[in-house]
């Protein structure tokens, strides 16, 4: 049997698809489409894989519950080929392939996207439709997965008047249409993986609105409108889900099923997309519940709504304790030990114990507990399900990018918390070992003494110059150069000597530099002792 997304019409193929393990929508697709077209409630900017795998899938679950009846309209402001090649040929349907660490796979057709539009003035009909949607009193929320860079504001774009080319400029132009339609309320919601993401959207919108007022292009009341929290809000959120580019193994599995829409699409802008999207099973989306015109009931699909302080606590729990520090520890040592997959590292007993003990023994005593998510359950999912997942082709080399910019938040905050609470810092053994490993990593030599490619980093040349006098060899060396590294508060968040850890880290670094095999031997020694 050949299966194609375009064949799906309100579940009349359900028996055939179910035989192959494909879950079809339980709602009337055409009815939801018609209702959404007439009374739109949600527009999402960013038509990439994370949107289809997470926000759109959450809404699909809400629609399947029978307790909601509107879909989401997706708008793409950067790579318009995604709309032409991955959405419209398939009636805006897509297949979500959920990859579990057990090796099990779930396949679900996502039908919550009712329209797909190119967010640019050069596409006249699409832009006119976006203006019409923004003028609709029914519109409750616009949201984004455009990456942190998407919130950038370029001086040149601010000079383009009411036809900017960057995403935030276009959104501000559409907000101006909503202002002219009667100062209608709306919530502007970032769903990107960056701290205090709502503030990034807010700053960008305010920048455009302020400039346009200054240039006399819009009335001062427009700036007052976007700043009025009874009209426009910019809530924070925390999102966490890994959605890799389309995977060849998944592609083959779908082809073997007879699912015809299984090919990868690479756009001219080098976006990797497909009619299907593969993603990990674990996911978290926590949103500050600060809406001015109502909102879609995404809690029906598992979204957690809370206050701003709680969103911030969840972010800190993840970034400072339960996920990001473990990632960085694995990236530094994984690169030196020759690994290219995080999942493969999890089969290495030394590395697995390394991150378990960093998380549970050293970081957890000062974890920020948000109350609504259990830190122990969160880190348990990371260690037992997420990192070992063989379907997640994540590499230590990717995670090692910009390490100098990550160490302060991922480890420095824990050290500061030990200081603030008067805890005994001599209990910190493996976190110092991570930081000692960073000096060894900067040499660009693996544990066999062979060169490896160090990931890009803005401070790379500067920090490599500090460790340049050191050799990876047995025998006496002068390690005093490390003082210039480990006293840098810009890199580590604290002066490691001032907090009493510098000498311990230096001592560990000496062991790591003691010739080929020293990285493995030192790691094993300290992990076992812990």
Positions of PLM-derived features:
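Substrate/ligand-engaging "lid" and interaction regions
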Residues: 2-45, 49-530
């Amino acid at each position: 049997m050949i299966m194609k997304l375009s064949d799906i019409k309100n579940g009349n193929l359900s028996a055939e698809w179910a035989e192959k393990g494909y879950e079809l929508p339980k709602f009337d697709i055409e009815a939801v489409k018609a209702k959404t077209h007439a009374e739109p409630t949600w527009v999402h900017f960013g038509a990439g894989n994370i949107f289809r795998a997470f926000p759109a899938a959450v809404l699909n679950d809400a629609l399947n519950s029978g307790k909601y009846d509107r879909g989401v309209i997706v708008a793409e402001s950067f790579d318009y080929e995604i709309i032409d090649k991955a959405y419209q040929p398939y009636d805006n349907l897509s297949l979500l392939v959920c990859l579990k660490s057990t090796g099990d796979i779930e396949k679900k057709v996502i039908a919550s996207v009712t329209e797909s539009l190119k967010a640019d003035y050069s596409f006249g009909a699409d832009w006119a439709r976006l203006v019409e949607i923004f003028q609709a009193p029914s519109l409750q929320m616009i949201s984004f997965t455009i990456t942190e860079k998407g919130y950038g504001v370029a001086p040149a774009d601010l000079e383009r008047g009411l036809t900017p080319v960057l995403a935030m400029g276009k959104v501000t132009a559409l907000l101006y249409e909503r202002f002219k339609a009667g100062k209608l309320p709306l919530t502007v919601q970032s769903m990107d993986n960056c701290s205090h993401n709502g503030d990034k959207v807010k700053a960008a919108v305010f920048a455009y609105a302020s400039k346009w007022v200054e240039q006399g292009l819009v009335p001062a009341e427009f700036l007052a409108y976007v700043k009025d929290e009874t009209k426009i809000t910019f809530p924070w959120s925390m999102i966490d889900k890994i959605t890799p580019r389309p995977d060849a193994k998944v592609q083959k599995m779908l082809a073997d099923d007879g699912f015809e829409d299984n090919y990868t699409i690479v756009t001219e802008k080098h976006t990797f997309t497909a009619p299907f999207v593969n993603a990990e099973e674990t996911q978290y989306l926590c949103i500050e519940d600060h809406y001015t015109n109502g909102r879609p009931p995404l809690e029906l699909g598992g979204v957690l709504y809370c206050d701003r302080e709680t969103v911030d606590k969840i972010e800190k729990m993840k970034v400072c304790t339960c996920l990001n520090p473990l990632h960085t520890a694995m990236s530094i040592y994984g690169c030196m030990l020759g690994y290219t997959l995080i999942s493969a590292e999890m089969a290495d007993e030394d590395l697995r114990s390394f991150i378990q003990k960093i998380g549970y023994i050293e970081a957890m005593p000062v974890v920020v507990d948000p109350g609504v998510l259990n830190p122990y359950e969160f880190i348990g999912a990371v260690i037992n399900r997420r990192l070992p997942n063989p379907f997640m082709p994540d590499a230590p080399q990717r995670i090692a990018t910009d390490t100098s910019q990550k160490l302060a938040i991922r480890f420095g905050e824990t050290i500061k918390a030990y200081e603030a609470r008067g805890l005994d810092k001599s209990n910190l053994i493996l976190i110092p070992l991570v930081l000692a490993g960073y000096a060894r990593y900067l040499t660009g030599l693996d544990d066999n003494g062979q060169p490896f490619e160090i990931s890009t980093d803005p401070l790379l040349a500067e920090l490599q110059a500090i460790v340049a006098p050191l050799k990876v060899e047995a025998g006496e060396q002068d390690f005093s150069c490390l003082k210039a590294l480990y006293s840098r508060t810009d890199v580590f968040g604290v002066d490691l000597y001032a907090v009493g850890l510098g000498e311990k880290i230096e001592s560990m670094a000496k062991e790591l530099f003691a010739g080929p095999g020293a990285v493995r031997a030192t790691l094993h020694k300290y992990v076992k002792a812990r």
